[in-house]
Amino acid sequence: MEKFSDAVSEALEKAFELAKDAKHSYVTENHLLKSLLQNPGSLFCLVIKDVHGNLGLLTSAVDDALHREPTVVEGAAIPKPSPSLQQLLLNAQEEARSMGDEYLSGDHLLLAFWKTTKEPFASWRKTVKTSPEALKELIIKLRQGSRMDSPSAEENLKGLEKYCKNLTILAREGKLDPVIGRDEEIRRTIQVLSRRTKNNPMLIGEPGVGKTAIAEGLALRIVQGDVPESLKDKHLYVLDMGALIAGAKYRGEFEERLKSVLKGVEASEGACILFIDEVHTLVGAGATDGAMDAANLLKPALARGTLHCIGATTLNEYQKYIEKDAALERRFQPIFVTEPSLEDAVFILRGLREKYEIFHGVRITEGALNAAVVLSYRYITDRFLPDKAIDLIDEAASLIRMQIGSLPLPIDEKERELSALIVKQEAIKREQAPAYQEEANEMQKAIDRVKEELAALRLRWDEEKGLIAGLKEKKNSLENLKFAEEEAERTADYNRVAELRYSLIPSLEKEIRLAEEALNQRDGRLLQEEVDERLIAQVVANWTGIPVQKMLEGESEKLLVLEESLEERVVGQPFAITAVSDSIRSARVGLSDPQRPLGVFLFLGPTGVGKTELAKALAELLFNKEEAMIRFDMTEYMEKHSVSKLIGSPPGYVGYEEGGSLSEALRRRPYSVVLFDEIEKADKEVFNILLQIFDDGILTDSKKRKVNCKNALFIMTSNIGSQELADYCAKKGTIVDKEAVLSVVAPALKNYFSPEFINRIDEILPFVPLTTEDIVKIVGIQMNRVALRLLERRISLTWDDSVVLFLSEQGYDGAFGARPLKRLIQQKVVTMLSKALLKGDIKSGMSVELTMAKDVVVFKTKTNSVV
């Protein structure tokens, strides 16, 4: 028989390489032994560990023996197998035949080594005190009835240890986070596991609601003994799909590995429970060219009840993969894991707070926990509690931890001040005049003073860092003592429990309390080690782009004078400006309805009166740039099918994967001004989509994903009823009543929009035609924009009243509003100035004054210092 397992073939190759590298003429059994010991995960080493053999001692003895081997000169022949190695392999083959195996594996080699009289193995074997017969019995037991019938069979022994992680051991070592809440789901899981057949729970829930945590909670309960007798002393293994797939080169190798895991679970006779996270990945795994997938390997064992298995998957994957396979579905008992309530999520965070405080070395306030849950629930709508709230706490704590390690702002400012003084002193030293000597002395005194202040600040910083580091160390020690107390209670070491519970732990808790008080009582602290609600709000703002931080004084002042700011750009529309300003103010202080958008407005009026300009002005005030506005020209949505442009194409159509222009824009920038320009041009189907957005603040796209629209401000513009509006204003004059104006345009609105659409609009705002006084103000606004562009070239621009009068008279048209005015300024002013700049008549540093000469705008220049 010359069939070797993959592991033995690899070991023989390495043995030849070792002999060649060491310039040995023969490959001996010691070279083979050395190569086998270099793979601690091999069957050879695993069996030695099971008989409590000292691998380190054996490795040292083999190294010494190889050093004593004679070497040959350069260019000698390739080393040949020694007679003793050949005899060892023959003995191993005999062991393989006696055990009915087709392939020679590591355990056969170990049995052959066990009978050898060659040193150093013979001397080392005496330290183990295990007979060859006992070793053979152990190997047979270890194999659990499997035979070496393939080259990879050796790799698949001990499949549980190789391809799974033991959660029970991790729980016993204190490496799992505490599982708070979820008692009902854990009890239901235990109930299903206690059944005679089909004892396989399937945890189904959205990502981040705590499915994996339920499995970890079960492992913690098993360790604590808080389970029924049927589950006591059980081991919970989690399947590592990465390890299972990695390195599976040949067809059938993946299935063989999975089979070895299942065999290990079955052979334990109920002592092992297998947890498969993302169980849907097994459906279809390994299935090529009509071969069975991995899920089919599970079915027989699941049906018999010999395999205790807990699965976990999301609702979508369960419907997509598991429900399609009815035979697999009926072998699992579904347990639905719902998202916890806000109160339960806060309760979960309280349980995890200590772990995060110890890891980051910070203090997390109760307010921060509440803020993390409430703000994540309101603003991060595409994820689920408690995962998103835990992530907020973790990121906020890491931000504080990073700041503790960075240079505090007061020290940074002092260092900059010191650098500036030293540079100034060096400049003064270069001046030889006696008059500068006194100034140099004063400068030296200032440098000495700043150095003293900097030294004092650094000393305070070092002290605070030391206190925080000491506090973190004490909290770590406290956690270790609490873990030791639990361990002692499990092993019934009650003397140790009493010592820890009533002496060591209270003493350390008192030290921590005193250290925290000492840290809090320090005046003028340089380091902030507390995570509060303001920091949580900052992290939410960084994630979503929604400014949810508590309003700063500057922002409050800006919102109070919002009307004045808007009136600087939009003239003659007091109704619209007041209504929009009130909506934004109520939203920013948190008093608006959280289940609806910030505001839904319909701007009605003739063209060129400032409807679109007001939307642009809002975007600039809220986001500091006009481009932040999401604008849709509704003339592009006149066909019935064009609704797919907004929410995405349906499945099977071109562009399905790309998403919709509205849904994707709001997903990326949920806090936006959304403008639907000329809404009356859109098809009726578009209005049906908008109903859902305006009422619930939710948009469902073509992929059934919900997009949060509750932080957006929606503005629609329309020309409906503009003629009636113009006629009414012409009769009544400039001062008009808003309700009276709306009553004029109401019939036209009802003819075009459905009642349910009108009912969802917060306010319909009429834009009245502009008066002559309004046009004069607009001339000033437009001319100021031209002047600002020239100021960038260091050119000052002024104009007299005659220019304003000419432009306002020539640029106003009742039918077109203020738009012709912009074109007139472009033709009469901007074009003239552009030509003068190109000719060199106007240069940088000049002042330009515009005036009228025979109905033509002309300019005068004079040289002036313009900054």
Curated annotation (Swiss-Prot):
Is Cytoplasm found in the keyword set? Answer: yes
Residues covered by region (Linker): 340-545
Chain positions covered by the region annotation NBD1: 158-339
Record region (Repeat 1): 4-69
Keyword field: ATP-binding, Chaperone, Coiled coil, Cytoplasm, Nucleotide-binding, Repeat, Stress response
Ranges for region Repeat 2? 81-145
Q: Where is the Clp R domain?
A: 1-145
Q: Where does ATP 1 bind?
A: G205, E206, P207, G208, V209, G210, K211, T212
Subcellular location, in the record's words?
Cytoplasm
Q: Which residues bind ATP 2?
A: G605, P606, T607, G608, V609, G610, K611, T612
Q: Where is this region: C-terminal?
A: 770-867
Note the superkingdom of the native organism.
Answer: Bacteria
GO terms of molecular function: ATP binding; ATP hydrolysis activity
- GO CC, one annotated term: cytoplasm
Among Pfam families, the record links this protein to:
AAA (PF00004), AAA_2 (PF07724), AAA_lid_9 (PF17871), Clp_N (PF02861), ClpB_D2-small (PF10431)
CDD domains reported in the protein's UniProt record: AAA, RecA-like_ClpB_Hsp104-like
Q: Which residues form a coiled coil?
A: 390-524
Which family is it part of? Belongs to the ClpA/ClpB family.
Comment field on protein domains: The Clp repeat (R) domain probably functions as a substrate-discriminating domain, recruiting aggregated proteins to the ClpB hexamer and/or stabilizing bound proteins. The NBD2 domain is responsible for oligomerization, whereas the NBD1 domain stabilizes the hexamer probably in an ATP-dependent manner. The movement of the coiled-coil domain is essential for ClpB ability to rescue proteins from an aggregated state, probably by pulling apart large aggregated proteins, which are bound between the coiled-coils motifs of adjacent ClpB subunits in the functional hexamer.
Please describe what this protein does.
Part of a stress-induced multi-chaperone system, it is involved in the recovery of the cell from heat-induced damage, in cooperation with DnaK, DnaJ and GrpE. Acts before DnaK, in the processing of protein aggregates. Protein binding stimulates the ATPase activity; ATP hydrolysis unfolds the denatured protein aggregates, which probably helps expose new hydrophobic binding sites on the surface of ClpB-bound aggregates, contributing to the solubilization and refolding of denatured protein aggregates by DnaK.
Return the protein name: Chaperone protein ClpB
Q: What is the source species?
A: Chlamydia muridarum (strain MoPn / Nigg)
Name the gene behind this protein: clpB
